[in-house]
Amino acid sequence: MKVVHTVGKRRTAIARATAKEGSGKIRINKKPLELMEPKYIKMKLMEPVILAGEALSNIDVDIDVKGGGIVSQMDATRTALGKAIVEFTGKMDLKEKFLSYDRTLLVSDARRTEPHKPSKSSKGPRAKRQKSYR
């Protein structure tokens, strides 16, 4: 039985996906994808599923996601799901389809928050006192 493990990251959210042979079920934190709320999150998570089409009919994907907020978790989950589908099927045309649609389906977003600097640390990394000319 073929099993594939993939990881998707976005800011502090980390999603770990496990793909194995099955009947096309996708579960996120042990909840079916169809029950995800709000609707915007569900629709964004459905994108790789719709793009994959019939290639997903014999794959079960379980995703565990931790950290971050709901949007970061959604982005990390999309990346992990996209990687799992491509790696499990091994189809290059599917990989090209994902990359042409949205690169973040296969590549994690490397941007992170900027660390605060020592001067006005609570105000942010680039905070300065306002300069007055009069």
Swiss-Prot record:
Which positions form S-S bridges? Answer: none
Q: What keywords does the record list, in alphabetical order?
A: Ribonucleoprotein, Ribosomal protein
Entry-linked PROSITE patterns? RIBOSOMAL_S9 (PS00360)
Compositional bias (Basic residues) at which positions?
118-134
GO BP terms: namely: maturation of SSU-rRNA from tricistronic rRNA transcript (SSU-rRNA, 5.8S rRNA, LSU-rRNA); translation
Q: Where is this region: Disordered?
A: 109-134
List the record's Gene Ontology CC terms alphabetically: cytosolic small ribosomal subunit
Q: Which GO terms describe its molecular function?
A: RNA binding; structural constituent of ribosome
Return the similarity comment. Answer: Belongs to the universal ribosomal protein uS9 family.
Protein's name in the database: Small ribosomal subunit protein uS9
The organism named in the record is Methanococcus maripaludis (strain DSM 14266 / JCM 13030 / NBRC 101832 / S2 / LL)
Which gene is the coding source of this polypeptide chain?
Answer: rps9
